[in-house]
Amino acid sequence: MDKERYSRSHRDDRDRDSSPDHSPQREGGRRRDRDVDSKRRDSDHYRSSRRGDREDERDRTKDRRGRSVERGEREGSRDREKHHHERSHEGSKEKESRSKRKDREEENGARDGKKKSRFADGNGERRSRFEDVAIEVENKDAQVSEGSGATNPTSGVTMGASTYSSIPSEASAAPSQTLLTKVSSISTTDENKASVVRSHEVPGKSSTDGRPLSTAGKSSANLPLDSSALAAKARKALQLQKGLADRLKNLPLLKKATKPTSEGSPHTRVPPSTTTPAVSTGTSFASTLPHTGLAGFGSIANIEAVKRAQELAANMGFHQDREFAPVINLFPGQAPSDMTVAQRPEKPPVLRVDALGREIDEHGNVISVTKPSNLSTLKVNINKKKKDAFQILKPQLEADLKENPYFDTRMGIDEKKILRPKRMSFQFVEEGKWTRDAENLKFKSHFGEAKAKELKVKQAQLAKANDDINPNLIEVSERVPRKEKPKEPIPDVEWWDANVLTNGEYGEITDGTITESHLKIEKLTHYIEHPRPIEPPAEAAPPPPQPLKLTKKEQKKLRTQRRLAKEKEKQEMIRQGLLEPPKAKVKMSNLMKVLGSEATQDPTKLEKEIRTAAAEREQAHTDRNAARKLTPAEKREKKERKLFDDPTTVETIVSVYKIKKLSHPKTRFKVEMNARENRLTGCSVMTDEMSVVVVEGKSKAIKRYGKLMMKRINWEEAERKEGNEDEEEEVNGGNKCWLVWQGSIGKPSFHRFHVHECVTESTAKKVFMDAGVVHYWDLAVNYSDD
């Protein structure tokens, strides 16, 4: 147990010391566990009292340590490989973060205008320091892990086919010396054809956030490297630097040689790349130069040097020079196949506004912006355009009232109210109104106004009549034309001025000037004389609505409610002291209840008073009933109102009856007496062929008389009792009465009811002709039972 515990603690301590990412908390926890174990071993429980036991324990401890060392070496190799892979992964992440930080710094440097340029002596051309480039290439080679296809964060070149051995940086070899790590190096040419190199340097190794990384913890995990390898690597970098410097010395000669050819060349210039292209090193470049198309470049000493210089510049992330674009395009294999050009976003234009809110340019001039036309198709805009296009003229008076000499300004006439159009009120149109108006206009235009009215009346009558015959269409007589009231002539002197003027004429008054000599001063007073009111010639107003006729039950209910309301009002007035309260109704039955002790003092006197009061009350009741009782004249008037209509009504109804035979005296008496009792006018004309009865009167009387003629009198039974039946009458169907026509007229034609017995039809017709209603006889003659 002790050996296993010791080997476990020893292995934990060794792993903790070898691991680069152990935390202080974990170290402190393990240290506390180790102290606890040591205290436990030093306690009395683990202390051995024998010397032999302690020696055995030492032997076991040595054996355990030996085995743990062997196991630790095996496990250490695996741990080192694991840590190596983790560091390589962290290095790739760090390179990516550096590349992102480099891009951000480039953008910030381009935005702020802070460019770091390196100048060279001589012709004033700008050249980059190749020492920095060599150190940058050396750092790149040192950071790329063995066998990995990581991406170089500085130049953006993918190293797919190349493999590099992992070596430590120069900072680990010489810790006292601070090394400048090149984050980015971009070459451009200005308008003076000088090369400009923008570089951003960060001293030492830095993390993604710019803080320096400590290499103390990683030194134990890195493998030991030989100093000869470092020297070889440095020599290689210096050789590469010298070769690149020699090859780029020929760039000015190349520029001078390309000027005459580029000016006379028909080829167009290739626009320079604005950003660093991402070029793959695995891309194949053509090593052979085409024989054709290089006529102007015979003076170039070393074409291969130019090709290799451009290739190295592309690998290190340099921009292509825009003046060498025609030369570079002549090498078909030199352009990278996987070229991606990412344009930088242009800066948005600056909006400048003056104090009034108008847009101005950098010199302060107001920029005229064309106002966009209104393309909206809303109903509001359409109506506005129509209103602007069609100007509505306001109404104007035809003649100015102030120019009229007879216009009185004191009348207070407002011209605005006259010109203001009347607002149309909401009116319902009856069905068929417009059709009737159109027909009336058609008749008026075709027949004239008078003829159109006659046709309208006839059509209305024809609509109410039967299909066979329409008695209303029969012309009664010529219509009496209405007499129009003649207009009064305009007098020479108005009646209100005749009493005031001296001579009663306007002749002496000229130009409207009136003096006291023209007037009767005594007639003038301080009173205002108003003219007599004249009613306008308008139709009479329609009669007011008639009250609703109630049933007997409803009338009783209303009477009870009125009596209760009256009694309640009386009690309220008595309560307020406005009326004297009535005396108590004392009877013999309630004598003791009402009077109490007073009834026992003088019973005889009290009884006499009670009987006298009861007799008075009874007499008052009788008098009230007698006062309410109708007189004989009132009873007769009431009966007349019940039997007959109001005599003031103008309407008169006419009924024409046709009777087959009216020879029986009983039926003749009924016909005559009922007509007179019902106050009907008319006549009864009897002939051998038929009899005609015409009655005129009010609606109630005509209704009762119609029941008599059509229902109450049995015409067939009356003829049988007479005993003068013939076989012809039985064949014809017996005696009968028909209502030929019933209608209303404006004025009655008869003054009383007469009975006429005529021998011939001409005599009977003459009776109706004298009354002016010969058409009644024609109606009866032409009437058929069918």
Curated annotation (Swiss-Prot):
State if Nucleus is listed as a keyword: yes
Q: Where is the composition biased (Pro residues)?
A: 534-547
Region described as Disordered = 1-223, 255-283, 532-557, 616-642
Primary location recorded for the protein, binned into one broad class: nucleus
* Protein's UniProt keywords contain Nucleus: yes
Q: Where is the composition biased (Low complexity)?
A: 165-176, 268-283
Q: Where is the composition biased (Basic and acidic residues)?
A: 1-80, 87-112, 123-143, 190-203
Gene Ontology biological-process annotations: embryo development ending in seed dormancy; gene silencing by siRNA-directed DNA methylation; mRNA splicing, via spliceosome
Q: Name one GO cellular component term.
A: nucleoplasm
Name of protein: Protein RDM16
Entry-linked Pfam families: PRP3, Prp3_C
